A protein has these predicted regions:
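A short gly/proline-enriched turn/hairpin at secondary-structure junctions
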Residues: 44-48, 82-92
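Positively charged n-region of N-terminal signal peptides that target proteins for export
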Residues: 1-4, 19-20
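Short, low-complexity N-terminal intrinsically disordered segments enriched in polar/charged residues
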Residues: 19-67, 71, 75
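C-terminal motif of bacterial Sec signal peptides marking the signal peptidase cleavage site
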Residues: 14-17
């Protein structure tokens, strides 16, 4: 009988521990978790988990590209959006981006943006508002036809402000032969 009481006590402890773990995980999701830092050579600022809704904004942004809906891309950007391309080009407005996007899609019938991962973070500055950044890995394919299609890997870092893209940095590298789709 004593062994049965001990067995039930241990089972009750295990079950209650599992319940606490689930509620702990739920609490973690709503709390800021330190995941890194940003350094501007004079100060170090904490980076914490960000707004998951911003990941959906970035998904909608690249879905619009895939649907060749540049008007939707335009509407997901602030008028004064600032984008830094991997080739050194700087885009300084949503209108300029729209015009460049039209030219790009006209020249690249096989353009496709495939998100492979995405994460939202907040940078907590001391003397200015917190910034929400979504960093996304993307496989980008482009070309006039299937024979000329090329693919590159991009990491796109977009600042989301009021539900729209405010600023972005695009980093790119060529794929090795064994990575190509």
């Amino acid at each position: 009988m004593k062994k049965l009481i001990i067995l039930f006590s241990v089972l009750a402890l295990i079950i209650s521990s599992c319940d606490n773990t689930v509620s702990s995980n739920q609490n973690i999701e709503s709390k800021a978790v330190l995941i890194g830092y940003e350094n501007d050579n004079t100060s170090k600022y904490n980076i914490v988990n960000g707004d998951i809704n911003s990941v959906e904004i970035v998904k909608a942004y690249f879905d619009a590209y895939n649907n060749r809906d540049l008007q939707a891309v335009y509407e997901l950007e602030h008028e004064d959006v600032l984008l830094y391309a991997p080739n050194g080009m700087i885009i300084e407005s949503s209108k300029q981006h729209l015009e460049g996007g039209e030219k790009f899609l006209a020249a690249n019938q096989f353009a496709k943006w495939e998100i492979t991962w995405s994460i939202s973070t907040h940078v907590n500055f001391e003397n200015k508002p917190t910034e929400n950044w979504v960093t996304t890995g993307i496989l980008v394919s482009s070309g006039k036809d299937e024979a000329s299609k090329t693919s590159v890997s991009r990491v796109v870092d977009l600042m989301i402000q009021d539900g729209k893209v405010k600023k972005g940095y695009i980093h790119q590298r060529q794929l090795s032969e064994n990575e190509k789709p």
